[in-house]
């Protein structure tokens, strides 16, 4: 494929050849653990929904879909109009595709069966946060979609589908996110590395722009809502102080950046190196991020990119989920910083990470 697909001449430094997301999936299908046509179509369905969601976000002000819808979700959070649109479009795309038997969404109280016959012959279950950081849409800031894919074992039926789908994140067969920002990126893993695709609006295709992503181990940034600092544990406060201390030998200081959209903060830290934190607090002892469709997919992805994800005491991907909307503390990003956070939270402090 060449620049003939794009509008106008290619700028200096542009990619000389590109691969679409669909071509990439077909080309590498033999390397995927679930290398079937149904699995490939499932990923295509998610990408189609992402394009529709992106279209609505880009035109939200014109279409009058900014602001709240007047309803609340199961989390007792006020829903944005775009929350409902994104949720609907993902469910529609997966229902039309016919490869998915079960979906679980942040916006729905319970899982939804997509199996038309109720026999669950379709083997994939998909969990998603349809529009992470949706409060940012009214101020034209970045938002995202997160998704997680599992296979259901033979013999699962509608009665026990959720029970058998609630499995540790280490058993995911695919996970990823879509970042809707200055450009729109689709980033995913199937357990064989991480690849990022940028949407070319001229041709309506996701093109491979970030192959074989690896998170830098030298951290550049940390992300946390420090407005909650009075609710943090003494160990976490000590860790934050350590993070802010300039390296006496190099003069390097880790900078703070926090957008308020998990996808956006994570995406930046994936590219630059860093740590995202949403800890347990006195008000939220179990944390706030949801395990099945926020922490698990991002943990699977970051480990494939050479990073680490933890509650501060346990690997995220080892957690056994107890419910669709279960919450967890999360420390995710460059492995050295996650390990440092674990050391502080476990009472080993500065000595374990080489001092402040």
From Swiss-Prot:
Name assigned to this protein: Fructose-1,6-bisphosphatase class 1 1
Enzyme Commission designation: 3.1.3.11
Subunit-structure text: Homotetramer.
Organism: Salinibacter ruber (strain DSM 13855 / M31)
Classification lineage: Bacteria, Pseudomonadati, Rhodothermota, Rhodothermia, Rhodothermales
GO MF annotation terms: fructose 1,6-bisphosphate 1-phosphatase activity; magnesium ion binding
Superkingdom of origin: Bacteria
Cellular localisation: Cytoplasm
Binding-site list for Mg(2+) 1: 106, 129, 131
Catalysed transformations (reactions): beta-D-fructose 1,6-bisphosphate + H2O = beta-D-fructose 6-phosphate + phosphate
Protein's UniProt keywords contain Coiled coil: no
InterPro entries: FBPase_C_dom (IPR044015), FBPase_class-1 (IPR000146), FBPase_N (IPR033391), FBPtase (IPR028343)
Cofactor(s), names only, from the UniProt record: Mg(2+)
GO cellular component: cytosol
Pathway assigned in UniProt: Carbohydrate biosynthesis; gluconeogenesis
Gene3D superfamilies recorded: 3.40.190.80, Fructose-1,6-Bisphosphatase, subunit A, domain 1
EC category: hydrolase
Residues that coordinate or bind Mg(2+) 2: 129, 132, 294
Any single GO BP term: sucrose biosynthetic process
Family: Belongs to the FBPase class 1 family.
Gene name in the database record: fbp1
Principal location class: cytoplasm
